[in-house]
């Protein structure tokens, strides 16, 4: 039996309340193809020369755009949404006509709507003794079932020669066999529905080029899909596929294949047949091995196999010489093959969070790379001079590894770099002059290392904007830090600092200063010169008083001085007009608060826990910070202001 023979079409007389849509004239499918509709379901109108335009049909919740299909997927580790659950909808209740698989329900209610008012059945409310909730004896009609509307949409698609059909986000569970009649279709969007399987008749759409099936409940594909020999883009993200359906390997015209977030465990050798693929995404599956067949896909430009269970890559990966983006992050890779050096077009290589102890020296051949990221591995050192060979690098991320020193290669390796992240390693020294050529370096993260001192040439880092030195063993800051006048963020928490140099006042662009958990006893008066400061974090130190100049910090919104030895707060704190959060908890010597605190009109949060505030009645303190502020306002000499 030929599934694609026209035959008799199913009767839809009882399904249509408005009749067949009016034709706009011309030959169905003639003229220009409708592009990028906005969700309208109207047919194509005549063009200015009188020829008919092939319309685009969008349905129900569809967006009218091809948003489900992208040219490439980002090499990100963003969380993926859960799969859409499958299953039928529209269970029946008492007093309701059962709903059939074709969605022909509530027809009697539609007829009732056309009756004269005097002949319609009345809505009678009955109150049951055991319930206060009124229960109607006749149920109100529900919206037309989504699967029923699909029949209408397909009929219109057939009649008007529509080339682009968007049925996305419509709670569809079944695609009827009448889809075979939509032979003009080149784009079909069925994403974000509840489809469990496709009918064999899908193979009749021989002109199809784009097919979006992502976010459904598919476990397989019909063999007839191989008849769609012009298919270029196939999107199967977020389904329930336990394997790559064999029919896919016979779709040799495919250029883009998305299989992200399924349950695939293996890739068959037949993959080598898809020689026209330029984009392949197998992200977030359960694949343990990528066979040699991958090397046959010489036209690939983007390959995403991240978030799987790969331990090795085949040497054949080096045959994919057109790759510009290769995402291997979040696997269990123990090594990278030397053939990776053949990928001279590579711009982005994601190797984060694997089990690598080294990377091959051949990577220095990949001179087009602009980002080098091996975060979350066990690497102790990079091949000598490798970073210097990659002269196009702008960001380098070596965090969460086992580096005991900076990579070898000298200042040349950072010439064009603007961001360096070496967080969470075992580095005890920043080499003198290592950044002498890094004129564009604006961000350095050395958090969680073993630094005991900063290099003497720190004053030459004049373009630095963000400097994170938290969780080291620093005992002092050099006075030359005053030269970092572009600095906006300075993180020095969890060190062994006893004082802050007066030259800190030269950092006039500073917005965030974090000195938490040090051994600081006194803040310099020059702190008041930081007029752009928004967050000042001083908690867990040994500070006994805040300088009166703190009142000059007009942009300060967050001040934390908890867990110190404060005896009082300066009355100038009332000048902090932008202050929203104030933490002064756990200062055992703080017995009173200045009335001027009531002048901080934007203060939203005040933490005074474990402060012996003897001047404020206990019942006021027990009422919480808001009541304390109210008390201060009521008893303040400024209450008339």
From Swiss-Prot:
GO terms for molecular function: volume-sensitive anion channel activity. SUPFAM superfamilies: L domain-like (SSF52058). LRR repeats lie at residues 161-182, 184-205, 207-228, 230-251, 253-274, 276-297, 299-320, 322-343, 345-367, 368-389, 392-413, 416-437, 440-461, 463-484, 486-507, 509-530, 532-553, 555-576, 578-600, 602-623. Keywords: Leucine-rich repeat, Repeat. Pfam families: LRR_1, LRR_14, LRR_8. Residues 26-47, 84-93 have a biased composition (Gly residues). Residues 1-19, 66-83, 94-103 have a biased composition (Low complexity). Residues 1-146 are annotated as: Disordered. GO terms for biological process: intracellular signal transduction; positive regulation of Ras protein signal transduction. The keyword Secreted does not apply. Acts as a Ras effector and participates in MAPK pathway activation. Probably acts as a regulatory subunit of protein phosphatase that specifically dephosphorylates Raf kinase and stimulate Raf activity at specialized signaling complexes upon Ras activation. Belongs to the SHOC2 family. This is Leucine-rich repeat protein soc-2 homolog. It comes from Drosophila melanogaster.
């Amino acid at each position: 039996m030929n599934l694609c023979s026209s035959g008799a079409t199913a009767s839809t007389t009882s399904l249509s309340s408005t009749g067949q849509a009016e034709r706009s004239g011309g030959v169905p499918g003639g003229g220009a193809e409708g592009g990028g509709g906005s969700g309208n379901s109207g047919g194509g109108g005549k063009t200015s020369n009188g020829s008919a335009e092939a319309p685009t049909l969008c349905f129900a919740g569809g967006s009218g755009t091809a948003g489900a299909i992208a040219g490439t997927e980002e090499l990100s580790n963003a969380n993926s949404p859960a799969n859409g659950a499958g299953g039928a909808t529209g269970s029946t209740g008492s007093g309701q006509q059962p709903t059939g698989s074709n969605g022909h329900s509530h027809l009697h209610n539609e007829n009732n709507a056309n009756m004269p008012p005097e002949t319609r059945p009345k809505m009678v409310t009955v109150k049951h003794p055991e319930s206060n909730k009124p229960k109607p004896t006749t149920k109100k009609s529900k919206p037309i079932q989504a699967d029923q509307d699909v029949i209408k949409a397909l009929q219109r698609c057939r009649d008007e020669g529509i080339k682009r059909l968007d049925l996305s986000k419509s709670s569809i569970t079944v695609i009827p066999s009448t889809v075979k009649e939509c032979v003009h279709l080149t784009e079909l969007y069925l994403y974000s529905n509840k489809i469990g399987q496709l009918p064999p008749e899908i193979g009749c759409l021989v002109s199809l080029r784009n097919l979006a099936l992502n976010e459904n409940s598919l476990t397989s594909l019909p063999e007839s899909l191989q008849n769609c020999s012009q298919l270029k883009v196939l999107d199967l993200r977020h389904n329930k596929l336990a394997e790559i359906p064999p029919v896919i390997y016979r779709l040799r015209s495919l250029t883009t294949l998305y299989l992200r977030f399924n349950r695939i465990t293996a890739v068959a050798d037949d993959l080598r047949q898809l020689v026209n693929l330029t984009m392949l995404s197998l992200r977030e599956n359960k694949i343990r091995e990528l066979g040699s067949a991958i090397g046959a896909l010489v036209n690939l430009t983007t390959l995403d196999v991240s978030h799987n269970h790969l331990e090795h890559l085949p040497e054949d990966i080096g045959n994919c010489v057109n790759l510009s983006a290769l995402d291997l992050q979040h696997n269990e890779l123990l090594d990278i093959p030397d053939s990776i050096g053949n990928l001279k077009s590579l711009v982005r290589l994601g190797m984060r969070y694997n089990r690598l102890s080294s990377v091959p020296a051949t990577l220095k051949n990949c001179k087009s790379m602009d980002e080098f990221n091996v975060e979350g591995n066990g690497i102790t050192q990079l091949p000598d001079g490798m970073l210097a060979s990659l002269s196009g690098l702008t960001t380098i991320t070596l965090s969460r590894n086992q580096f005991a020193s900076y990579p070898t290669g000298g200042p040349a390796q950072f010439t064009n770099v603007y961001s360096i992240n070496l967080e969470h390693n075992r580095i005890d020294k920043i080499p003198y002059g290592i950044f002498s050529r890094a004129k564009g370096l604006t961000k350095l993260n050395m958090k969680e290392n073993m630094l005991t001192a900063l290099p003497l040439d720190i004053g030459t880092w004049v373009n630095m904007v963000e400097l994170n030195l938290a969780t080291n063993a620093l005992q002092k800051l050099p006075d030359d830090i005053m030269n970092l006048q572009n600095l906006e963020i300075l993180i020095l928490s969890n060190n062994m600092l006893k004082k802050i140099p007066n030259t800190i006042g030269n950092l006039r662009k500073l917005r965030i200063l974090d000195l938490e958990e040090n051994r600081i006893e006194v803040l310099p008066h020059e702190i008041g010169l930081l007029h752009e400061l928004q967050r000042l974090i001083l908690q867990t130190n040994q500070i006994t008083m805040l300088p009166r100049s703190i009142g000059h910090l007009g942009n300060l919104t967050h001040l934390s001085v908890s867990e110190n030895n404060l005896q009082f707060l300066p009355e100038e704190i009332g000048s902090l007009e932008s202050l929203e959060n104030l933490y002064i908890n756990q200062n055992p010597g703080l017995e009173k608060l200045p009335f001027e605190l009531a002048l901080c009109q934007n203060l939203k949060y005040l933490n005074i826990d474990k402060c012996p505030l003897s001047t404020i009645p206990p019942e006021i303190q027990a009422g919480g910070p808001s009541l304390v502020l109210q008390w201060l306002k009521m008893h303040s000499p400024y209450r008339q202001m």
